[in-house]
Amino acid sequence: MTSPATLKVLNAYLDNPTPTLEEAIEVFTPLTVGEYDDVHIAALLATIRTRGEQFADIAGAAKAFLAAARPFPITGAGLLDSAGTGGDGANTINITTGASLIAASGGVKLVKHGNRSVSSKSGSADVLEALNIPLGLDVDRAVKWFEASNFTFLFAPAYNPAIAHVQPVRQALKFPTIFNTLGPLLSPARPERQIMGVANANHGQLIAEVFRELGRTRALVVHGAGTDEIAVHGTTLVWELKEDGTIEHYTIEPEDLGLGRYTLEDLVGGLGTENAEAMRATFAGTGPDAHRDALAASAGAMFYLNGDVDSLKDGAQKALSLLADGTTQAWLAKHEEIDYSEKESSND
């Protein structure tokens, strides 16, 4: 039951068209510990949806939920995360997930925070599970997997259990809420660098500013021709957070990256098992060119953020080389056989 003091804070927030960051943290913190009744959660989410998500809403909610998250021992410097908001309705192959594996095979330290599908047929967890990459690792074994492979997956519900307090209301509302935007921001690894796709291009600058507030040193926010990916079917809008804290906005075309141009239909995917098979084909060099170039575009951005290359084009070409010479295929063949969820240490 919502306490009188908590209800007072909520009412003040609902009546405030321009809340501060501190006020947002104050109103979202009770939500992380289940202090709101469902009707009050619905009022908060609907109000933010109606007036439009602001910097304070997103940054404040992220800080409140990160404070309540279960910790992960490897954090910050040298880590990169990649995710998208989803909700673009395109139902493409798992581009960002596949690109993350290419980047990890090329030495980028990827701690990917994700979940099962919400708005598409296959979320990152669904396709990784189909690739025999373990999901339900305890913290110690997730660290071991990362140290062995440069990659580990942090299953969002395991590290952000506070989100469960809002799930019934989200499902009942049946419209997008601030939590569609929040998911990619809540990695307990608090990565130094991040690429995030947004289905709503109006959120690009806003998310870049939130990244800066959350301590990211370099980040890319992208919206590709209606999708939450770097597009090989049209123009991609980019907001780049640089190390000096400035945010630069620009556009890129597939040709700028040295890649082909395709249609969105060329990238349509299916269930997690189907997308996993498509990914294996791309890694083996037998998949469609559209799949190869789409994954290379996003992996290239990860190499760029990591400081391995000087441009997005150079990054895409590096990704193509890793696919062409079999590096990524060999990486997957090696590491899908490691399952620390079943491997007992000598101290067990």
From Swiss-Prot:
Pfam families reported in the protein's UniProt record: Glycos_trans_3N, Glycos_transf_3
Binding site for Mg(2+) 2: D228, E229
Alphabetical keyword list: Amino-acid biosynthesis, Aromatic amino acid biosynthesis, Glycosyltransferase, Magnesium, Metal-binding, Transferase, Tryptophan biosynthesis
Binding site for anthranilate 2: R170
Catalytic activity: N-(5-phospho-beta-D-ribosyl)anthranilate + diphosphate = 5-phospho-alpha-D-ribose 1-diphosphate + anthranilate
GO molecular function: anthranilate phosphoribosyltransferase activity; magnesium ion binding
EC number assigned by the record: 2.4.2.18
Superkingdom of source: Bacteria
Chain positions recorded as Mg(2+) 1 binding sites: T96, E229
Function: Catalyzes the transfer of the phosphoribosyl group of 5-phosphorylribose-1-pyrophosphate (PRPP) to anthranilate to yield N-(5'-phosphoribosyl)-anthranilate (PRA).
Protein name: Anthranilate phosphoribosyltransferase
Organism: Corynebacterium glutamicum (strain ATCC 13032 / DSM 20300 / JCM 1318 / BCRC 11384 / CCUG 27702 / LMG 3730 / NBRC 12168 / NCIMB 10025 / NRRL B-2784 / 534)
